[in-house]
Design a protein with these regions (language model features):
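Subset of outer-membrane beta-barrel
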Residues: 1-353
Length: 353
């Protein structure tokens, strides 16, 4: 299980501000159910969203120039609970699958207000509620080059499918002087949210169970999916339109070094870790590609040693993430991740002599 806390620095046109938040990351368990068969289950966030910012400008109405402010906010996300199994049909080859239940709510809003209170405030509130499933498939092969040198090759695939959500848009006109609100709800039977085809491939090199280095490359084909779109002219029309998403690609490199996992000297049992990644955007903002992302992390796996257990690990890492795109807000995030890996003896067979 694990949790994280982060500080994000936002920068635009020379102006900066900081935002802080924390989150629960995961709770996962795995065990051997039978020879060559393993089972895993857990609760993990699938998506999270949270923002609130505004953009100011001027608007001319008749002979009057007014200050206008667009306030953007978003909240919610999808949760994921899964059950998985892995099987080794022959030596070196393993295959597995996870079936997940996804649920959650997503809300986004844009509010346009003016400096003159006699001018009505306009708001658009978008919402979707998801209850669906997700399927993940995987395979890996362990290649033994020698007693101390091993290579693991892996591949994952998640098929695309419709997850529904019943997207809905509520537009409102608010007269701030009279407090009169006029609202209109837009929806459509053909509107939905989708998950794309997702592919992943990678390898890990393992030297004497001491040095491990690896790379992963993933592709999420968002660019092949339509997006529920509501007419911008406030008419009651909606449709599924292509061109708002992009195919996302991500490359991750990482390594771990543990001098001697079962050495009597404590510092030799610590796991030292490092990694970097680069990802392209998966969406467009006002017709322009969204922010790219780079990250780097350093961490430690500290053994927890007591009379009953010497295999559990306290995992601590620091991560820096930068997101940027020309003409958009730049984000620099520093994140602290803390996790516990319990390797308990729950399924050990006791022998009585």
């Amino acid at each position: 299980m694990g949790a994280s806390g982060q500080i994000t620095n936002l920068e635009e046109n020379g102006k900066k501000m900081n935002a802080r938040n924390s989150s629960f990351d995961y709770a996962v368990a795995a065990f051997r159910a039978a020879p060559h068969l393993g089972v895993s289950f857990g609760l993990v966030p699938f998506t999270t969203m949270g923002y609130n910012f505004n953009a100011s400008g001027t608007t001319t109405l008749g002979n009057e120039t007014l200050k206008s402010t667009n306030t953007y906010s978003g909240d919610g996300g999808l949760h994921q609970v899964y059950l998985g199994a892995g099987w080794q049909p022959v030596k070196g080859l393993s295959v597995g699958a996870n079936i997940s239940y996804l649920w959650g709510d997503i809300t986004k809003s844009v509010v346009l207000s003016f400096s003159n209170a006699s001018v009505s405030t306009l708001s658009k509130n978008y919402s979707a509620s998801v209850a669906s499933y997700k399927l993940d498939l995987g395979a890996q092969y362990l290649l033994s080059l020698s007693d101390k040198n091993k290579v693991i090759l892996g591949f994952t695939y998640s098929p695309k499918h419709k997850i529904g959500g019943n997207p809905e848009l509520v537009t409102s006109t608010i007269n701030t002087n009279t407090s009169v609100v006029v609202s209109d709800t837009l929806s459509g039977n053909g509107l939905r949210l989708d998950l794309p085809d997702m592919y992943g491939a990678g390898f890990t090199y393992n030297y004497d169970n001491s040095l491990k280095v690896g790379a992963d490359f993933t592709v999420q084909r968002w660019g092949k999916l339509p997006q529920p779109t509501f007419a911008s002219d406030n008419s009651s029309t909606s449709s599924m339109q292509y061109g708002n998403y992009l195919t996302r690609k991500k490359l991750t490199l990482g390594g771990e070094y543990c001098p001697r996992e079962y050495d009597r000297i404590f510092v030799r049992r610590v796991h030292y870790r490092a990694g970097v990644s680069y990802a392209t955007p998966y969406y467009k903002i006002n017709g322009n590609n969204g922010p790219k992302e780079v990250s780097a992390s350093l961490g430690f796996g500290i053994p927890i040693v007591n009379s009953m257990n010497n295999r559990s690990i306290l995992n601590i890492s620091g991560q820096w993430v930068r997101q940027w795109a020309p003409g958009m807000i730049k984000e620099n995030t520093f994140r602290i991740n803390i996790g516990l890996t319990f390797n308990e003896r729950w399924f050990m067979k006791w022998k009585v002599e």
